[in-house]
Amino acid sequence: MGNMGIWQLLIIAVIVILLFGTKKLRSLGGDLGGAVKGFKNAMSSEEEKKALEETASEKATPSVEKTAPNAEKKTETKDKEQV
């Protein structure tokens, strides 16, 4: 009952074509394709935005790491001056 063969699918396709016509189905397919394309573009732009944010955060993090060793050197020189 749940298994549809090729003949059942062909009969359903013929009925759909007779009900809606080829022009309507063609325009429906074009609309569906445009929606899928828009969705893909939105997803790719979202991924690019995340990648840019990650790159920006990675660039900000090393500058903090560079300042930390300088702070350690200053404390070492203060310790030497006190001795």
From Swiss-Prot:
GO terms for molecular function: protein transmembrane transporter activity. It holds the Pfam family TatA_B_E. Keywords: Cell inner membrane, Cell membrane, Membrane, Protein transport, Translocation, Transmembrane, Transmembrane helix, Transport. One of its GO terms (cellular component) is TAT protein transport complex. Its main location: membrane. It is found in: Cell inner membrane. GO terms for biological process: protein transport by the Tat complex. It is a single-pass membrane protein. InterPro entries: TatA/B/E (IPR003369), TatA/E (IPR006312). Coiled coil: none annotated. Part of the twin-arginine translocation (Tat) system that transports large folded proteins containing a characteristic twin-arginine motif in their signal peptide across membranes. TatA could form the protein-conducting channel of the Tat system. Belongs to the TatA/E family. The Tat system comprises two distinct complexes: a TatABC complex, containing multiple copies of TatA, TatB and TatC subunits, and a separate TatA complex, containing only TatA subunits. Substrates initially bind to the TatABC complex, which probably triggers association of the separate TatA complex to form the active translocon. This is Sec-independent protein translocase protein TatA.
